[in-house]
UniProtKB/Swiss-Prot annotation:
Protein name per Swiss-Prot or TrEMBL: UDP-N-acetylmuramoylalanine--D-glutamate ligase
InterPro entries xref list: Mur-like_cat_sf, Mur_ligase_C, Mur_ligase_C_dom_sf, Mur_ligase_cen, MurD
Record family assignment: Belongs to the MurCDEF family.
Catalytic reaction(s) noted: UDP-N-acetyl-alpha-D-muramoyl-L-alanine + D-glutamate + ATP = UDP-N-acetyl-alpha-D-muramoyl-L-alanyl-D-glutamate + ADP + phosphate + H(+)
Function: Cell wall formation. Catalyzes the addition of glutamate to the nucleotide precursor UDP-N-acetylmuramoyl-L-alanine (UMA).
Lineage start: Bacteria, Bacillati, Actinomycetota, Actinomycetes, Mycobacteriales
SUPFAM superfamilies: MurCD N-terminal domain, MurD-like peptide ligases, catalytic domain, MurD-like peptide ligases, peptide-binding domain
GO biological process assignments: cell division; cell wall organization; peptidoglycan biosynthetic process; regulation of cell shape
GO cellular component, one term: cytoplasm
Keywords on record: ATP-binding, Cell cycle, Cell division, Cell shape, Cell wall biogenesis/degradation, Cytoplasm, Ligase, Nucleotide-binding, Peptidoglycan synthesis
Main location: cytoplasm
Length: 496
């Protein structure tokens, strides 16, 4: 379809034919937003402070503007559509809010266009969020829907953007959404939504933990609300949900209205009186986190009528994504696991607790999160720790307090060489990769090579050398995938 209806439904207000819309951000999301707005007859102007990002838009004949100029002109726009990376504190968005100009994200735009019938009959949105496990759960959900014979598309923060899939013939959308996306999607009301867990994360973007939690809670405002009962924050959100149907899931035996585990099988007592879904042993994701992900996905799939057999088939054949508890190698009785996607302390704790004896490679950008509770919970599993990245001193401090007997090595590189150790970790326990890094090797690769070598020296047969960093990767790597690949390369080198 093309063109907005002349009589604009309330769900699209203030977006109408010819409406002046400021697109904040000229990168991939901004390109998709500008294309959709143009297609439906609005008048977009693209804002970015990088001229390189604006050039393709200008070549397509779209007006472009810098952030500072856009702030001065903000009252001339009916709407701002922001890319997820723009926080509310960004001067441009703060100016829009002060001027009373509505701010949507790309997900909000997609939701409203879909709800208005601009792409045909609206789809049913099944939305997954949480601090950890979103991608695995959403992928499992999509596999369950397909196994059940449903026309479903995987999208959101995984795969394709929602705006990019609305032309596809689908009845259901399996959507992974981050807190950034949800913050700018205030009207989202999914068919069913799940909050897996809530832990400190992205506090450099959200002003407070309360704001982060409130963003996550938006997925529980539709018809069916699903949340993890073993997580106190997620359970509290479920208690406050306005959804007509509220479903919890837990690792223990489920009560009526819940999914859980009984006799080593997943059981549904929410959408059936007492339905056995599948054996825990068939879940390919290791540890309790894999069981929780499968329970959440099953709850959403059951909410739209997917039968137990299809759920079991999907889980049995499911393959975990790269850099998510991925076994890289087993050598000399030591298992090397890449969980580079564990980018916050909550995820790292879940990862460590999946194994009995762990040499933990950790560190990076903590984004304001504390590790103390997590390190205390995992201390009994740790037989060694190798710390990397900008915020490694915070990890060292938590280990010193909660796991003082665990040997610790810090790997230092580049601009960090002037501060090689903390009080808790003496200079003798620091590896300076700047002294002998290989020609042409990136800092990240050199750091990981040293880290894996140190971890190998600590490990004994039966141990797991686990990359579960608890932090973001951008201080030394281009992303979590780059960090995971560096780990795999280093492992292959050390076991040769």
């Amino acid at each position: 379809m093309s063109g907005l209806p002349r009589s604009v439904p309330d769900v699209l207000d203030p977006l109408g034919p010819g409406a002046p819309v400021l697109v904040a951000g000229g990168r991939v999301t901004g390109q998709a937003v500008a294309a959709v707005l143009t297609r439906f007859g609005a008048t977009p102007t693209v804002c970015d402070d990088d001229p390189v990002m604006l050039r393709p838009h200008a070549e397509r004949g779209l007006p472009t503007v810098s952030s500072s100029d856009a702030v001065q002109q903000i009252t001339g726009y009916a709407l701002v559509v922001a890319s997820p990376g723009f926080s509310p504190a960004t001067p441009l968005l703060a100016a829009a809010a002060a001027a009373g100009v509505p701010i949507w994200g790309d997900v909000e735009l997609a939701w409203r266009l879909d709800a208005a019938g601009c792409y045909g009959p609206p789809r049913s949105w099944l939305v997954v969020t949480g601090t950890n496990g979103k991608t695995t759960t959403t992928s499992m959900l999509h596999a369950m829907l397909i196994a059940g014979g449903r026309r479903a598309v995987l999208c959101g923060n995984i795969g394709s953007a929602v705006l990019d899939v609305l032309d596809e013939p689908a009845e259901l959308l399996a959507v992974e959404l981050s807190s950034f996306q949800l913050h700018w999607a205030p009207s989202l009301r999914p068919e069913a939504g799940a909050v897996l867990n809530i832990a400190e994360d992205h506090l450099d973007w959200h002003a407070t933990m309360a704001e982060y939690t409130a963003a996550k809670a938006r997925v529980l405002t539709g018809g069916v609300a699903v949340a993890g009962l073993d997580d106190s924050r997620a359970a509290a959100l479920l208690d406050g949900s306005p959804a007509q149907v509220r479903v919890g899931f837990r690792l223990g035996e489920p009560a009526a209205g819940e999914l859980g585990v009984r006799d080593a099988h997943l059981v549904d007592r929410a959408f059936s009186d007492d339905l056995t879904l599948l054996p825990v042993a068939s879940i390919p994701v290791p540890g309790p986190v894999g069981v929780l992900d499968a329970l959440a996905a099953a709850a959403l799939a059951r909410s739209v009528g997917v039968p137990a057999g299809a759920i079991a088939d999907a889980v049995t054949s499911f393959r975990v994504g790269r850099h998510r508890a991925e076994v890289v190698a087993v050598a000399d009785g030591i298992t090397y696991v890449d969980d580079s996607k564990a980018t916050n302390p909550h995820a790292a704790r879940a990862s460590v607790l999946a194994y009995p004896r762990v040499v933990w490679i950790a560190g990076g950008l903590l984004k304001g999160a504390s590790l103390h509770a997590e390190v205390a919970a995992m201390a009994s599993r740790l037989v060694g720790a190798v710390l990397i990245g900008r915020d490694r001193a915070a990890v060292a401090e938590a280990l010193s307090r909660h796991a003082p007997d665990v040997p610790v090595v810090q790997v230092v590189a580049g601009e960090d060489t002037g501060m090689p150790a903390t009080v808790e970790v003496p200079v003798a326990c620091v590896l300076d990769v700047a002294k002998d890094d290989k020609a042409g090797e990136t800092v990240g690769a050199a750091v990981m090579t040293a880290a894996v070598a140190a971890a190998r020296r600590m490990a004994q047969p039966g141990d797991t050398v686990l990359l579960a960093p608890a932090g973001a990767s951008f201080d030394q790597f281009t992303g979590y995938a780059d960090r995971g690949e560096a780990f795999a390369t280093a492992v292959r080198a050390v076991i040769r």
